[in-house]
Amino acid sequence: MCSSDLPDLKMLCALSDALANIPEAELRLTPNETAFIINLTGEEAQKVLALTVGGAETAFEASVSCIGGQTCQVGTRDSQGLLAACVAAVREAKLPADALPCIHISGCPSSCGTHQTGAMGFRGASKLVDGKPQAAFTFFLGGNSRQGQEAMGRELGVMLEERIPAFLVELGQTVAASGMDFDAWRQADPDGVERVAAPYLA
């Protein structure tokens, strides 16, 4: 299941109906807001997989987002809406599957989207433009939740919400042009993300 783009109700209903007819089948949720379906035979797994076509196909499309300000009373920004816009922009740009990492988005400082522990993260914020507050997100880079490699992301600045999809597309295009995947590119060019992000943080 894709955590970055809510599946339509038809998909969820079809999945529920299929699992109801499979003894011992279980759906388990993870801290990264993804789901695993367990206790399936090979044939059952193929049927369930066919029901989830159109969900997350890449690490980026499996990005994590809290429920966001459209639902949460505490959330200041629409993190789900931002992620859906980013996934749509990246799909339209037809970037290679490994050009962008899984990102984490929280609508506010409560950190429900664990923005500090993602390779890249965004936290809901505001930015003054011509003296008026505009929807924005604070950008974090370099977080890691892997055991033995734990790190909190560094705060790089505030980016207008409307500019984030374009930033991610440009970043993905830059990575793709290198012929490397995102992780290899970051190792080869440690300042690359900051360089691409700079105009969007201005």
Please give the residue ranges for each predicted region:
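Conserved small/polar residues in nucleotide/adenosyl-binding loops
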Residues: 1-3
